[in-house]
Amino acid sequence: MVRTRVLLLGGSGRFGEYAARCLVRSDRVSEIGLAGRNQEMLKRRVAEIGDKAHSVPVDIQDTDRLASVAEKYDIVVNAAGPEWETLLPALRAAIDAGVDYCDLGADARVAERQLELDSQARDRGVAAVIGIGYDPGIDNLLVMHALKRFDSVDDIKFRFQLALPDELMLEAVNAFSSSARVDSSWQLVMSNVKGPVRVYRDGSWISVNPLDHGIDLEMTDGSIKTAYPVEAPELITIPRCVPQVRNVSCVFTITPPEMSKLVYREAERISRGEVSVKEASRSFLETLARNREFWLTGKAPGWDMRIVMTGWKDGRQARYACWPIRIASTSIPLAVAALTILRGDVSMRGVFPPEACFEPMSFFEEVALYMPPEDQDKPLYGESMTWM
């Protein structure tokens, strides 16, 4: 077996740490460089991960330096944020170094710019998989698997729900209160919900004001919530990989309603040009921190995702829904993608999304191997089919 070296960007962060723990379990990985700017945190993570890990002080924005570092590794795995600051420099550095690459990218606008680097990556012999986490990532592959249920598909809808306050929100507010750090995940939420956003209708992308296009959705608990279109990479990549599908949308609902109003109030300020994404996120976290008793009481399950497709099977119209169960993870798919590339199982070269290069079921089964023991008896995903 060929022993390989991994450069993990964002190695001191939440997602990077868990990806590192998965990667070091593989005999194929001989070394993993945890890269970032916070040297003290990196040293702490190295001690936690073990003998295969070492720290690599580097600023992702310094593309030349990062490319020089990356040349010594077999793959660059990017779990750093915020995404609009880290994804493009990291991908460019990997291409310059001639090193394979994968990331957690969930910013649609950045994903489009990454895809523009496809020819450069091919010229350098680089395989670069973008957006391979939970969503995007697992959901893209669920779509490819679900397409087999139909003879033809009319519409694909990605439904995202964020039930708050969850554990990650509490972490974000605590970090803001103690160090004024503005959580990059919440910056991503603000960036994705601000208008205008795109939907894919009748084979074309069109821009809409999300608050003018709300739809009522029945949630898993039977309640009805209003969901709004949201900008997401799935909306960009699925139509490219499945051109026969002419309608794709991503919709998003936040509960409770008071939290949703607060998020969209800040998002509208961004859209009007009054504040930046980071400033809006800071204002949002400040509001929560000032009145914890109101905003942060109780504990909600957090993020939920499901895919709903309508189409035709044997001459009958049907609606199919599917959702992750045992494969509900962000960091594990990133690690599995890296290992798949390192094994040589991705023959393509260029920049592409996961649905273009991974076989869904075998990928899901490998992800499931890294899930906690208490989840091993659960199904990989849930599904339902309704004839219309």
Give residue spans per PLM region:
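Conserved Rossmann-fold cofactor-binding substructure of NAD(P)-dependent oxidoreductases
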Residues: V58-Y73, P82
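Short beta-strand element of Class I
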Residues: E31-G33
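ADP-ribose/adenylate-binding Rossmann-like module
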Residues: A93-A111
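N-terminal Rossmann-like NAD(P) cofactor-binding module of classical short-chain dehydrogenase/reductase
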Residues: Y73-A79, Y101-C102
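Rossmann-fold NAD(P)-binding glycine/threonine-rich loop
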Residues: G105-A127
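N-terminal Rossmann NAD(P)H-binding glycine-rich loop of SDR-like oxidoreductase domains
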Residues: V6-C22
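C-terminal catalytic/substrate-binding lobe primarily of soluble NAD(P)-dependent oxidoreductases
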Residues: R149-M388
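N-terminal Rossmann-fold cofactor-binding loop
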Residues: A35-Q39, D59-I60
